[in-house]
């Protein structure tokens, strides 16, 4: 199976070159492109990474010869945050939309372990916003404000020793997401000999730790020589200042010290001119292209691969977007059916488990009901037995009462004389018996009433 490069080479070999018989007019295409680009304008986004007070804002002001009036940052920020500001600049008839992203509070925390993470997240968020705009059905990239970072100016403190661990971690995290240009800030604070040793030490550490910084391109013959020479001067040692001081007969941007003057645009004093030449005058468009063709494409490819889109099938066969879409659609449909079947089985299983629980609860309730019913019946039988016994006692008592009421008359008819002789004694005995009968009758009535209440 031929690779894509072989296919393109084969097509190129079958392309015929012809000589035109006259003027057509497509020679004006470069002019058309220039006119359209001038009409649209350009955008350029710079990320400045460095600790607070290292001179980021001053250098940006000096690079574009403009006072952007950024707010001063505090040294007591609890976390790192990024502050983006966009400006409209115009030079001759060329308009530039410049966005400067400053890292506020970078390196000011005691725990610097995650100081680089907000920077990585910001760059990824800009890539994601552009990708979402690109994936829309109705895209508007012509009017879309591209906020992707084109270059990262990484400011290194002029310690004269080596890179800090935070600097290595940060640059290592950013080198596959943005074009990094390392800068030695405030280069006028160390001597020239120390500066050269410091440059060599920094480049050696970057190579050893595998940090990929931006290399000025040498594939274009018009800029290959100067770019190749400038690659040997990295990292640039820079000084920034908007103050103008009179040197000789002219005013120059410089910094005044008791021991002398450091001229910003003097190549013998610092590398500011080299930085401006490489960043703005020569390689600004290459930085924009590298951001789109390399870093953004890497992010886009990873995102599409996460979504399941691939260019080559299992048999190293090129796949079109439609084929990939159909394959993913078939895969998702199968996955959905499988999950639906799993959910149905899970639902049936849970229904069975719930039914078993309910049946067990029903059996327990039925057993409890039968137990209570049996107890109630036993209690009722006991009460019925007590009621029957009380009724029998009541009937016996009534008979006894009737017998007691007839007893005095029978005694009078059988023995009148004895009654008269014992008149007083019998009257007393009759009254006592009558009272006892009344008391017994009341007790029986109260007992019957109490039993009926218990039965009710």
UniProtKB/Swiss-Prot annotation:
Instruction: Provide the binding site for GTP.
Output: 50-57, 105, 186-194, 240, 255
What does the entry's PTM section describe? Proteolytically cleaved in vitro in a calmodulin-dependent manner.
**CDD domains per the UniProt record, alphabetical:** CDC_Septin (cd01850)
Modified residue Phosphoserine is at which positions?
Answer: 418
Segments for region (G3 motif)? 102-105
* Subcellular location per the Swiss-Prot or TrEMBL entry: Cytoplasm; Cytoplasm, Cytoskeleton; Cell projection, Cilium, Flagellum
What's the short name of a Pfam family annotated to this entry?
Septin
Q: Which GO terms describe its cellular component?
A: cell division site; microtubule cytoskeleton; septin complex; septin ring; sperm annulus; sperm flagellum
Q: Name one GO biological process term.
A: protein localization
Provide the residue span(s) of the region labelled G4 motif.
Answer: 185-188
Renumbered to this chain, region (G1 motif) spans 50-57
Q: Does the keyword Cell inner membrane apply?
A: no
Which keywords describe this protein according to UniProt? Cell cycle, Cell division, Cell projection, Cilium, Cytoplasm, Cytoskeleton, Flagellum, GTP-binding, Nucleotide-binding, Phosphoprotein
UniProt domain Septin-type G: residue ranges? 40-306
Q: Which family does it belong to?
A: Belongs to the TRAFAC class TrmE-Era-EngA-EngB-Septin-like GTPase superfamily. Septin GTPase family.
Query: Tell me, how does this one assemble?
Result: Septins polymerize into heterooligomeric protein complexes that form filaments, and can associate with cellular membranes, actin filaments and microtubules. GTPase activity is required for filament formation. Interacts with ADGB.
What is the designated name of this protein? Septin-10
Source organism per entry reads: Rattus norvegicus (Rat)
């Amino acid at each position: 199976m031929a690779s894509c490069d072989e296919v393109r080479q084969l097509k190129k070999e079958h392309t015929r070159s012809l000589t035109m018989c006259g003027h057509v007019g497509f020679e004006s295409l470069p002019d058309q492109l220039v006119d359209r680009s001038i009409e649209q304008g350009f955008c350029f986004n710079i990320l400045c990474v460095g600790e607070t007070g290292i001179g980021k804002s001053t250098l940006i002001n000096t690079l574009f010869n403009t006072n952007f009036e950024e707010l001063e940052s505090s040294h007591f920020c609890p976390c790192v945050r990024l502050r983006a500001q966009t400006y409209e600049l115009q030079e001759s008839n060329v308009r530039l939309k410049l966005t400067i992203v400053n890292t506020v509070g970078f390196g000011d925390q005691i725990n610097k372990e995650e100081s680089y993470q907000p920077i990585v997240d910001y760059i990824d968020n800009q890539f994601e916003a552009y990708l979402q705009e690109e994936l829309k059905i109705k895209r508007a990239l012509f009017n879309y404000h591209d906020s992707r970072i084109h270059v990262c100016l990484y400011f290194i403190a002029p310690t004269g020793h080596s890179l800090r661990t935070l600097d290595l971690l940060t640059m290592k995290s950013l080198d596959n997401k943005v074009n990094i240009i390392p800068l030695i800030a405030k280069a006028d604070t160390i001597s020239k000999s120390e500066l050269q040793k410091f440059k060599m030490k920094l480049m050696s550490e970057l190579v050893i730790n595998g940090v990929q910084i931006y290399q000025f391109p040498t594939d274009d013959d018009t800029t290959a020589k100067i770019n190749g020479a400038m690659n040997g001067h990295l990292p640039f040692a820079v000084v920034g200042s908007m103050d103008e001081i009179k040197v000789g007969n002219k005013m120059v941007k410089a910094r005044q010290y008791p021991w002398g003057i450091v001229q910003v645009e003097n190549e013998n004093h610092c590398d500011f001119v080299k930085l401006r030449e490489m960043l703005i005058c020569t390689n600004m468009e290459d930085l924009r292209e590298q951001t789109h063709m390399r870093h953004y494409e890497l992010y886009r490819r990873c995102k599409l691969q996460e979504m399941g889109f691939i260019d080559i099938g299992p048999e190293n066969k090129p796949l079109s977007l439609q084929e990939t879409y159909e394959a993913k659609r078939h895969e998702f449909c199968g996955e959905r059916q499988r999950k639906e079947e799993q959910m149905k089985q899970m639902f049936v299983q849970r229904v069975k488990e719930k039914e078993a629980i309910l049946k067990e609860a029903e059996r327990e309730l039925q057993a409890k009901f039968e137990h209570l019913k049996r107890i109630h019946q036993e209690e009722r039988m006991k009460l019925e037995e007590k009621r029957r016994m009380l009724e029998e006692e009541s009937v016996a008592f009534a008979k006894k009462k009737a017998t007691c009421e007839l007893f005095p008359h029978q005694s009078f008819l059988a023995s009148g004389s004895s009654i008269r002789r014992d008149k007083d004694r019998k009257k007393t005995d009759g009254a006592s018996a009558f009272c006892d009968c009344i008391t017994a009758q009341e007790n029986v009535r109260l007992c019957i009433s109490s039993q009926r209440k218990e039965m009710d």
